[in-house]
Amino acid sequence: MVICLHCPDQDDSLEEVTEECYSPPTLQNLAIQSLLRDEALAISALTDLPQSLFPVIFEEAFTDGYIGILKAMIPVWPFPYLSLGKQINNCNLETLKAMLEGLDILLAQKVQTSRCKLRVINWREDDLKIWAGSHEGEGLPDFRTEKQPIENSAGCEVKKELKVTTEVLRMKGRLDESTTYLLQWAQQRKDSIHLFCRKLLIEGLTKASVIEIFKTVHADCIQELILRCICIEELAFLNPYLKLMKSLFTLTLDHIIGTFSLGDSEKLDEETIFSLISQLPTLHCLQKLYVNDVPFIKGNLKEYLRCLKKPLETLCISNCDLSQSDLDCLPYCLNICELKHLHISDIYLCDLLLEPLGFLLERVGDTLKTLELDSCCIVDFQFSALLPALSQCSHLREVTFYDNDVSLPFLKQLLHHTALLSQLIYECYPAPLECYDDSGVILTHRLESFCPELLDILRAKRQLHSVSFQTTKCSKCGGCYIYDRHTQCCRFVELL
């Protein structure tokens, strides 16, 4: 238990007084607002409207809910690309319906107007605001394509197809009204509409909703999947869909529990858990794996990593229990031998031997760029097993080791090794045990007296960028003290 005797109710140093500056609307803004208030006039003006005004007027109409104008703008959009950006967070059901009705009008056109160039509509948050691409086809997936009819076929027409891309579908237990409407709309037009979702979040699980999603969404285009607050047997239910995700790049398993969700509260036995995990399909393209609060990963980490086809770039494990066998398998897993980012945090490691982790660092020494070993209760002798390999990780850019139990002499030894890593631009080290009294009270004056010498160890070998020393979080307020080379003093930070 760590206690801070100076727990401020708020950190006054972080308060900033800001003044709101009022900017009067420009003549253009006033003209646009006046135009939008007359829907009939606004719609009739679209054919002669300068292209440069389309994004501005669309954003105003979207924000203020002029759904009739939105509907009319889609079929005459003069750019190949339309991204809603952050505005998608404010998209209600009526606005969504208006935009989809505009797409229906576009699909129904037998002759494409010379003005409309729309090929991609993007319900993603890539951009801060509504944006219209000006480079036709450059780096963009086709949104509107035309399949040419068979030559000399009687009564044949050009078949139009649309691709609609959305950033994320969030399924929290049951589908919300807007998502349900979008899926049904796309399903009813499945011959001409292809709905692509780059990111899928499933929080809780209604099997009927999952089945409904994959009737419409192209699973092979999902690049990021987040599974949160589901049971392990429900994870097994998703296996057939995981097999279809040929482009899955990032997988997050967050709070996957080992009990049945439908009335049976008994914990699964180890044999059943192993059987369910072993059924996970091969993930051919996965590059990033995040595992948080998954209790049954203990003793089964090797089975999880077995599913990987390509070498991982990022492995992040937090709030889990690991066994010695889990650590022992790491150096011998070929699919993590090219890691660029290794993050292990909030895992109790003080009872384990870390030599296997040192062997892993040796294997990834030529590729590793970030290393996080935070809040793992690692003590001096365990850290010592990592030092020889750590100093050979010459491409490291970031290291964080805060909230571990190291002494001042060992911390100096650690710094002598990281001082050899010339590419480091961000470093966060734990405050040594000597910065706490026997009751766990943080002694900031000691940290302030130790840190100049600690910084000198690094400064003697290389140029410093961002270097800090951080205490363990206070058990009362959750804050901590940080000493960094820029302020050269301890400052209180309230951690979220």
Curated annotation (Swiss-Prot):
LRR repeats lie at residues 115-139, 194-218, 219-244, 245-282, 283-308, 309-340, 341-364, 365-392, 393-417. Gene3D superfamilies: Ribonuclease Inhibitor. It comes from the Eukaryota. One of its GO terms (cellular component) is nucleus. Disruption phenotype: Expression of spermatogenesis-associated genes including Klhl10, Tekt2, Tdrd6 and Tnp2 are significantly up-regulated in the ovaries. SUPFAM superfamilies: RNI-like. Coiled coil: none annotated. Transmembrane segments: none annotated. InterPro entries: LRR_dom_sf (IPR032675), PRAME (IPR026271), PRAME_domain (IPR050694). Keywords: Cytoplasm, Leucine-rich repeat, Nucleus, Repeat. Expressed in the ovary, ovulated oocytes and preimplantation embryos (at protein level). Not detected in testis, liver, kidney, spleen, heart, lung and brain. PANTHER family: OOG4 PROTEIN-RELATED (PTHR14224:SF22), SIMILAR TO PREFERENTIALLY EXPRESSED ANTIGEN IN MELANOMA-LIKE 3 (PTHR14224). Interacts with RALGDS (via Ras-associating domain). Interacts with HRAS (in GTP-bound form). Belongs to the PRAME family. This is Oogenesin-1. It comes from Mus musculus (Mouse). The gene is Oog1.
